[in-house]
């Protein structure tokens, strides 16, 4: 096993901050308890566009399923069952998306690399700690700096523009649920599209929809393409995330081939750590732990961050 001083290649050694350093630590370093009461949001142009596109595509799919395929159907129970199922999956997917986007992924407080903070740690002789030169914080083990969030994130897996946030220690659960529910709703939409095409061909496109045949074909084709793309992407991401959790290894650690200096959790221990508690239906609930939080603009030097 390598010594702790060489275990992370992305860490640079810098002296700790002094009282004369040109860094506004008073305004940028807030307590973790205070940050827990605020909503987290990253003001990144690309991320916000991707997040809005995600919502629009889900709303489009819901429109086609509801108004093009189900409401015109003569089978009442077919429409009710599939309508309730698809809309539930859509709500769960969008809720998981919101929780992923608005949850602090595990950001390390900025500017805490001060002598006063160091003295409060009561370090053992010879113990090595690291300072991130970009956000001036004491960098915990397995934390990595995100250039978009402009923060060090604990157990950072990757930054996903589609949720406009990093996937890290505190929001990985919601990201996994988001990919799962999008994949399930995509499969459901593709099955409904197939049944709708069969129904329209048998009825010669006259009674299968309230829209004209050309419009119906265009809407269904676009939904099929969307469903295929969404299912492929989210199914792969879901499998990758589950594999990472079971192996207790983030995507960054895997890509950088970092040798583990921590004691890896067993497969079920990793799942329990991410989803909380023993296996239950609560694992699939994106509303667990939800509470309304206050929104507050915060000015950050040199960063597009607007965190809550």
UniProtKB/Swiss-Prot annotation:
Occurrences of domain DHHC (ranges): 130-180
Membrane topology, as annotated: Multi-pass membrane protein
UniProt-annotated catalytic positions: 160 (s-palmitoyl cysteine intermediate)
EC assignment: 2.3.1.225, 2.3.1.-
Reported function: Golgi-localized palmitoyltransferase that catalyzes the addition of palmitate onto various protein substrates and therefore functions in several unrelated biological processes. Has no stringent fatty acid selectivity and in addition to palmitate can also transfer onto target proteins myristate from tetradecanoyl-CoA and stearate from octadecanoyl-CoA. Palmitoylates sex steroid hormone receptors, including ESR1, PGR and AR, thereby regulating their targeting to the plasma membrane and their function in rapid intracellular signaling upon binding of sex hormones.
Organism field: Rattus norvegicus
Class of this enzyme: transferase
Protein name according to UniProt: Palmitoyltransferase ZDHHC7
Gene: Zdhhc7
